[in-house]
């Protein structure tokens, strides 16, 4: 038909809906229920759209909203039976070109004001052709999805799932409920945000912590043996970024083979005693988990892949419809987002947009069939992100190996510049801090300051368990203000920070956290966090500006 869809979640606010509506002036609005209709009719329309409601309406409802042209989903099905045989409709559909706009996805992401990303049919079709490079799927297999149905990554998955005759299971972002769904359905593939995999790992370690001392020691021993076995296996198989020939390669291979032989008996025994039981958490059919971006802690990726739960990290943006790079099933390169997709050109450039002459860290630029048409009615913003050479500035700081394997380090706009001129990427520090069971979320701050500070949202359940373990009073979970003011809690968090952010873990002196403050209010999706559970840094820096100011007094 050539129509353009503009998907949005049911959690859309009236403010956001008005911005989008007044920009695109849609002729038809499809809503899930009457609650959403009641919100949308508050918008001051220039031209009233046709409303389609998924749920059925009774006669009383139709009279109540008689000022609007409203149809139900059932009405549309009846219309469709007639229209699909209409020769005029068939002719219109035949004239749709692959380069025509297919969708506008409005995204605020981590920055704030929504922008409309225009994607063509060709953009979306490129994602379909690229998907098979990640996993080899079969008809009837079950694909569990956690992201909202309108999200660009989810849409890419959905097109492929239906095209290949698979079954799509939509689950929830709540880990416990998701695990119940896994138990009931036994999916083959699971696509989820990093936070969910982190939560599963934390729950595993939480259960282990309840075991007797000997059982805990056995678990940690076999995990270390599995780590060693996995590292050696990847060295032997060449599953690491190619940064050029080194005389140490042959030595590494020999050491890898030796290490693999030594670790194999312990890994095999660990599988029988421990890991096979853990793997059952994800059902009997599990093949691979897919997660996106660079926000997955390396320790979590290593843990899962070492014990036999393969996680394949991928990378993309809504502006790239979304896929840019992906790891491949059975060929995962730990700590990276995999290889740049075929047909895509990637470059690492400096802050001025010049391509780096030597391999190093810089801003990732990409050019290919997946790059968006532009931002809807925003030529200025489009020109800022897509250059005259067709390359799109992802805004991500990355490294690119000789064989096109990409490693995402952080966001260009997130870079903190201390007053001594040192540049700090907050993401690796935050990811490391969140490895602590006591820390739910961490936000590193310190722009133009002498040192770094951090806003820490504690894991209050784990804090109370810690207090109990050291013989201290347990607080009412609802009395968060009292918990964050407790000196024992403050010392415990400080000890965790020092244990994680230090030279031994690869952090430089100026990257260490010298001051922190504890937050009592949990982060919310749509406020402090995006739908992908990434922190919305600009919102947090503004909302907690007084707390940040007090860190540097």
Task: Name the predicted role of every residue range.
Residues 125-142, 149-250, 258-275:
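Conserved AMP-binding/adenylation subdomain of ANL enzymes
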Residues 102-128:
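Conserved AMP-binding A3 loop
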Residues 4-79:
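Structural core segment of the AMP-binding/adenylate-forming
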Residues 107, 344, 352-359, 363-418:
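Conserved ATP-binding/catalytic segment of the ANL
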Residues 56-60, 220-234, 265-281, 286-309:
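Short gly/Ser/Thr-rich phosphate-binding loop of adenylate-forming enzymes
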Residues 70-71, 83-106, 113, 136-142:
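Conserved pre-ATP/AMP-binding loop-to-beta segment of ANL
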Residues 121, 296, 305-309, 317-335, ...:
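Active-site loops of AMP-binding adenylate-forming
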């Amino acid at each position: 038909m050539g129509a353009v869809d503009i998907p949005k979640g049911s959690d859309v606010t009236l403010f956001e809906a008005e911005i989008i509506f007044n920009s695109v002036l849609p002729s038809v609005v499809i809503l899930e229920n009457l609650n959403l209709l009641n919100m949308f009719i508050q918008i001051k329309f220039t031209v009233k759209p046709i409303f389609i409601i998924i749920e059925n309406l009774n006669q009383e409802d139709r009279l109540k909203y008689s000022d609007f042209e409203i149809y139900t989903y059932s009405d549309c099905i009846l219309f469709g039976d007639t229209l699909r045989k209409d020769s005029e409709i068939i002719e219109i559909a035949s004239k749709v070109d692959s380069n025509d706009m297919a969708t506008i996805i409005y995204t605020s992401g981590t920055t704030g004001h929504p922008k409309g990303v225009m994607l063509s049919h060709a953009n979306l079709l490129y994602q379909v052709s690229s998907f098979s490079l990640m996993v080899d799927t079969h008809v009837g297999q079950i694909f569990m999805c956690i992201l909202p149905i309108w999200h660009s990554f989810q849409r890419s998955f959905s097109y492929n799932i239906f095209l290949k005759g698979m079954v799509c299971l939509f689950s929830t972002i709540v880990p416990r409920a998701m695990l119940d769904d896994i138990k009931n359905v036994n999916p083959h593939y699971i696509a989820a945000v990093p936070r969910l995999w982190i939560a599963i790992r934390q729950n595993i370690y939480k259960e282990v912590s309840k075991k007797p001392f000997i059982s805990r020691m056995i678990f940690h021993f076999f995990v270390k043996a599995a780590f060693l076995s996995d590292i050696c296996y990847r060295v032997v198989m060449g599953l690491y970024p190619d940064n050029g020939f080194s005389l140490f390669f042959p030595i590494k291979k020999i050491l890898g083979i030796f290490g693999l032989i030594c670790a194999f008996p312990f890994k095999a025994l660990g599988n029988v005693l421990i890991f096979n039981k853990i793997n059952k958490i994800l059902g009997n059919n599990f093949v691979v988990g897919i997660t996106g971006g660079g926000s997955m802690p390396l320790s979590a990726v290593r843990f899962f892949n070492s014990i036999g739960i393969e996680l394949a990290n991928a990378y993309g943006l809504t502006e790239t419809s979304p896929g840019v790079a992906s790891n491949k099933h059975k060929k995962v390169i730990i700590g990276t987002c995999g290889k740049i997709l075929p047909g895509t050109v990637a470059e690492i450039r400096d802050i001025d947009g010049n391509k780096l002459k030597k391999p190093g860290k810089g801003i990732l630029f990409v050019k290919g069939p997946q790059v968006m048409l532009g931002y809807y009615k925003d030529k200025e913003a489009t020109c800022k992100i897509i250059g005259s050479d067709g390359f799109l500035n992802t805004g991500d700081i990355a490294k690119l190996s000789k064989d096109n394997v990409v490693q995402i380090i952080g966001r260009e706009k997130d870079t903190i510049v201390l007053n001594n001129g040192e540049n700090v990427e907050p993401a690796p520090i935050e990811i490391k801090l969140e490895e602590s069971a006591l820390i739910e979320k961490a936000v590193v701050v310190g722009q133009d300051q002498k040192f770094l500070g951090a806003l820490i949202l504690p894991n209050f359940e784990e804090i109370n368990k810690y207090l109990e373990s050291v013989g201290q009073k347990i607080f009412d979970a609802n009395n968060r203000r009292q918990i964050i003011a407790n000196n024992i809690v403050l010392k415990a968090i400080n000890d965790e920070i020092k244990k994680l952010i230090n030279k031994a873990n690869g952090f430089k002196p100026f990257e260490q956290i010298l001051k922190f403050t504890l937050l009592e209010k949990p982060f919310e999706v749509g406020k402090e966090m995006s739908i992908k559970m990434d922190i919305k840094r600009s919102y947090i820096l503004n909302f907690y500006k007084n707390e940040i100011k007090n860190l540097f007094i």
